[in-house]
Amino acid sequence: MARYLGPKAKLARREGTDLFLKSARRALSDKCRLDNKPGQDGRTSGSRTSDYGNQLREKQKVKRIYGVLERQFRRYFAEAERRKGNTGETLLQLLESRLDNVVYRMGFGSTRAEARQLVSHCAILLNGNPVNIPSIQVKPGDVVAIREKAKKQARITESLNLVGQMAAVTWVSVDVAKLEGTFKQVPDREDISGEINESLIVELYSR
């Protein structure tokens, strides 16, 4: 399955919520009616979505938020199921601990896609070493930094300025002057978006 390269607003409308695929400088406009699915043109459907349909939609939504493909997502779920604790919560923690997501949470990328691109282009250091694998799992205490040759990129400065206007997450710390941050801890469930119902995903894979 290839990555979706079409309009981001269309995906947000399909899932009925902002997937944070667009940066704050190009946020979803008022014209993007999230309560209207693509092709509805304002009309509502008389059919109800089945339990399976709701579960599938929730999985698709989370995959799109984190930019993960189906095979990868299944591996994350299998790993979450293998570990002790709440499977759904562990799944989200694994996704939040991806390097591209941590780069995004630290404000170095205005979207996860932009953060993923920074990693793929070797613009990121992990504990002082250059890396280019977005899916690397970051551990508590790990230091993520912008490589010297990438520090002058305007998009990084713009992204940090935008993040400064929003509430920062508490489980990472960022030194803006040094363009580096520390992954302090794996986030608790309450630190992760409440727009996700991970129990539906667990139900889907338990069928």
Swiss-Prot record:
Extent of Polar residues compositional bias: 42-53
GO CC field: small ribosomal subunit
Annotated stretches, region: Disordered: 31-56
Basic and acidic residues bias spans: 31-40
Xref: Pfam families: Ribosomal_S4, S4
A single GO molecular function term of this UniProt record: rRNA binding
Domain S4 RNA-binding: 97-158
One GO BP annotation of this record: ribosomal small subunit biogenesis
Record's keyword terms, sorted: Ribonucleoprotein, Ribosomal protein, RNA-binding, rRNA-binding
UniProt subunit comment: Part of the 30S ribosomal subunit. Contacts protein S5. The interaction surface between S4 and S5 is involved in control of translational fidelity.
NCBIfam families assigned: PRK05327.1, rpsD_bact
Stated family: Belongs to the universal ribosomal protein uS4 family.
Function: One of the primary rRNA binding proteins, it binds directly to 16S rRNA where it nucleates assembly of the body of the 30S subunit.
Protein name according to UniProt: Small ribosomal subunit protein uS4
Organism classification: Bacteria, Pseudomonadati, Pseudomonadota, Betaproteobacteria, Burkholderiales
Gene that specifies this protein: rpsD
